[in-house]
Amino acid sequence: MSFKDLRSFISHLEECGELKRVSYPVDPYLEMTEIADRVLRAGGPALLFEQPKGHSMPVLANLFGTPKRVAMALGKEDPLALRDVGELLAFLKEPEPPRGFKDAIAKIPMFKQALNMPPKTVSRAPCQEVVMTGDDVDLTKLPIQHCWPGDVAPLVTWGLTITKGPRQKRQNLGIYRQQLLGKNKLIMRWLSHRGGALDFRDFQEKHPGENYPVVVALGSDPVTILGAVTPVPDSMSEYAFAGLLRGERTEVVKALSCDLEVPATSEIILEGYIAPGEMAEEGPYGDHTGYYNETDSFPVFTVTHISHRKDAIYHSTYTGRPPDEPAMLGVALNEVFVPILRKQYPEIVDFYLPPEGCSYRMAVISIRKQYPGHAKRVMMGAWSFLRQFMYTKFIVVVDEDVNCRDWQDVIWAITTRMDPTRDTVMIDNTPIDYLDFASPVAGLGSKMGLDATNKWEGETNREWGTPIVMDEAVKRRVDDIWDELGIEQSPTL
């Protein structure tokens, strides 16, 4: 099932018991966060706060609060089915040449589908049903969530920031948090390596002294939202990728104030510009690490136009110590990454980003080891292959007999198959998440790789241990007589 807009997805979730309407008045200042956090930690539904205090616009929270709902947003019922999305991305990133005539014929539909999904431009769109300009622009009328007691101001969290640079043929979609600064001002917190920041830098070089047009879309259809956080090939737009997943071209409409194209069915659109040199101190804010981050200076986004649908819905989230919504997204998108990594490194059996590792700061990889030093090659490959893993601080590599998603198994492998000196890889002065205050320099720190695989000749001079395994016939015999033993419960094996 595909969803043309956020409202159709909300209706589907409600029918499936995956969304709860909250009619009791709830304050966007702290209360929504506490409620959403309790519900998410219990594996509960998405929440639609129908009466946010002080505002007439309802607030949608916890939309992607479980891996199941992430899968549902992409038209799947099971998170494991998201590997199909990963297979598609792996193909788009590196299409295999046909192995023969029959294979070429078989691949035609996939190539044709990929080429036929550019966005569809429409002249009128729901996101422009209500338009405000000039003095009518007032961001404080939006029920922007103030998430934590130490946050400096309300924070826009789920906005799709749309930019275009002079070096790119396509638009870029990115999700960057935005601090409310005034009735028509937001702080655009994009890190220097992110697409929006790179577009802005290129624009400044080519058009010095000119305002840079920017648009932010809130409440877009779920596939377009998730397209902005998946590893889409650089040559493909997020709109085209969303169309591929949806099986229908993404409808876009020209912005009111510039040539950027925005998702036509979005709930709210903020249009404006970033003036050269206009910066402001951003933060502190509670973040996905579970800590308040440092303050720093970022560009100011001046909003000149606000447009929205009639009876618009404001889409929001919070970030905090895992589990939070970004962590749940990470668990689901983990399945997307597996086929992409396997395409480049077929020896990879499984890949896991534990949510308690703040989505991406730790990875565990199981491999079919083929030669001495193999684990180190896989570490280096994972760190460098996808931009999403450039901030991964710790990588543990285990053999295929170890379940990389089971900490008991992983810790057993680390403590029995590793020598701390021989099997630990340390790399200094690498890119690190700006929010990682544990690094000695902002944005620059070290990485650690742990080779927890069985060691081969050349890696050790010792006779290697043989794992203890019970005889299968004995296990079957005990299974057969278990009920006769009078033992109430069989341990999980």
UniProtKB/Swiss-Prot annotation:
Sites where the protein binds Mn(2+): 172, 238
Cofactor section: prenylated FMN; Mn(2+)
EC class: lyase
Endpoints of the signal sequence: none
Regions that span the bilayer: none
Pathway terms, separated by semicolons: Cofactor biosynthesis; ubiquinone biosynthesis
Domain of life per record: Bacteria
Catalysed conversion reaction: a 4-hydroxy-3-(all-trans-polyprenyl)benzoate + H(+) = a 2-(all-trans-polyprenyl)phenol + CO2
Key words, A-Z: Cell membrane, Decarboxylase, Flavoprotein, FMN, Lyase, Manganese, Membrane, Metal-binding, Ubiquinone biosynthesis
Protein EC: 4.1.1.98
Subcellular location: Cell membrane
PANTHER family in the cross-refs: 3-OCTAPRENYL-4-HYDROXYBENZOATE CARBOXY-LYASE-RELATED, FERULIC ACID DECARBOXYLASE 1
Subunit structure: Homohexamer.
Family as reported in the entry's similarity comment: Belongs to the UbiD family.
Role description: Catalyzes the decarboxylation of 3-octaprenyl-4-hydroxy benzoate to 2-octaprenylphenol, an intermediate step in ubiquinone biosynthesis.
Name listed for the protein in its UniProt record: 3-octaprenyl-4-hydroxybenzoate carboxy-lyase
Organism: Shewanella amazonensis (strain ATCC BAA-1098 / SB2B)
Gene designation per UniProt: ubiD
